């Protein structure tokens, strides 16, 4: 569960994980001021075999999620239904942190998303949490939609 301003998002298990351990999660996004559901559905953006590691709202109140593979996604509206009554929503990837790691053991601990940048704590050496005895150093990573590499770019 995460909230900011007038919005509240609740995440829950829709069913047991798949055989490859991918979580089957759902979400409901509420406007708490009006007591109405804005959006609900599956968290379809999780990478195969990964799990949800962080949820939050950016400073523009867009809902963001990150999985254990380091993929940051944002809930975006894609239009309206055929009756023009309900907005349609989808998860869009906005940053893949895998390519930004210096080692396969490195990862990024998200703090917030602000002005198009992920504010995070870089973790090294297989650590999955920041050291609680030291003040962490944060870094910012600009959001950029991940693109698939073509066959030609691999040569």
Locate the predicted segments by residue.
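Intrinsically disordered, low-complexity regions in large eukaryotic scaffold subunits
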Residues: 14-16, 21-155
């Amino acid at each position: 569960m995460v909230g900011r301003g007038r919005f509240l998002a609740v995440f829950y298990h829709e069913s047991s994980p798949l055989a490859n351990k991918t979580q089957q999660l759902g979400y409901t996004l509420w406007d708490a001021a009006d007591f109405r559901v804005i959006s609900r559905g599956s968290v379809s953006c999780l990478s195969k075999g990964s799990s949800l590691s962080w949820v939050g709202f950016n400073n523009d109140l867009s809902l963001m999620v990150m999985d254990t593979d380091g993929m940051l996604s944002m809930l975006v509206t894609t239009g309206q239904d055929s009756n023009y009554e309900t907005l349609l929503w989808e998860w869009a990837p906005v940053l893949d942190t895998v390519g930004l790691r210096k080692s396969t053991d490195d990862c990024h601990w998200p703090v917030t998303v602000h002005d198009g940048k992920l504010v995070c704590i870089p973790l090294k050496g297989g650590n999955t949490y920041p050291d609680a005895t030291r003040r962490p150093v944060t870094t910012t990573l600009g959001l950029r939609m991940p693109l698939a590499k073509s066959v030609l770019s691999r040569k």
